[in-house]
Amino acid sequence: MAHIKVVRRSMRPEEWNDLRFGWLKRYIINDKLPIDNIVIKDARQVTENNYEFYSDEYRPLKKGDLYFTPDGTAFIKAETEVPDSLKNKELWLYLKTAAEIIVKANGKFVGGIDPNRDRVLLTPYIGTPDKIKFEMQGYNRSKPDDERNPESLAVRGCRQIFNGAYLVTI
């Protein structure tokens, strides 16, 4: 195995500021528009691209609702108007989740959201249209990630409380 010589040194103040600002930028949001008309349909994957749905109809998904089933897939749809105040700005979809969600906006894949990524940049893919139609497919694990905690070992199911989805500018 090759060894890499590590040079230990202090960071210059500029480097430290750049590093910290990069961390802080993740939490600075200029405009935050809630996406209200979200609907969801829960399913269980039977085989590849074959799902058994728990209901034939989509149900509304509101802030504070439980969503996802243990080891389940959810199909989520939403549509929102882009106000004039957000036109010609860099738009992002912001959604906190413990699941893995792939996102389409106006029919184009724009990226994914997961516990490590809570937003997706939209503008390079769809510009700034008058309306944005979202289609999302998410997968939720059947147990928490932290297996060191004896209490979480007995828990089967990572149901989540929906905290809302937002159209934001940064």
Residue locations for each model-derived region?
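An acidic-aromatic loop/edge-strand motif
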Residues: 2-27, 31-38, 46, 136-170
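Extended low-complexity, serine/threonine- and proline-enriched intrinsically disordered segments
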Residues: 35-53, 100-107
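Short Pro/Gly-enriched beta-strand edge/turn motifs at strand-loop
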Residues: 58-64
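Short beta-strands within extracellular/lumenal beta-sheet-rich domains
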Residues: 64-84
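Intrinsic-disorder/low-complexity, polar/charged segments enriched in Ser/Thr/Lys/Arg/Asp/Glu/Gln
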Residues: 73-79, 90-92, 131-133
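Solvent-exposed residues in well-ordered beta-strands and their adjoining turns
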Residues: 81-83, 96, 137-139
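Aromatic-lined ligand-binding clefts that engage carbohydrates, nucleic acids, or primary amines
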Residues: 85-105, 114
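Beta-strand-rich ligand-recognition modules
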Residues: 102-150
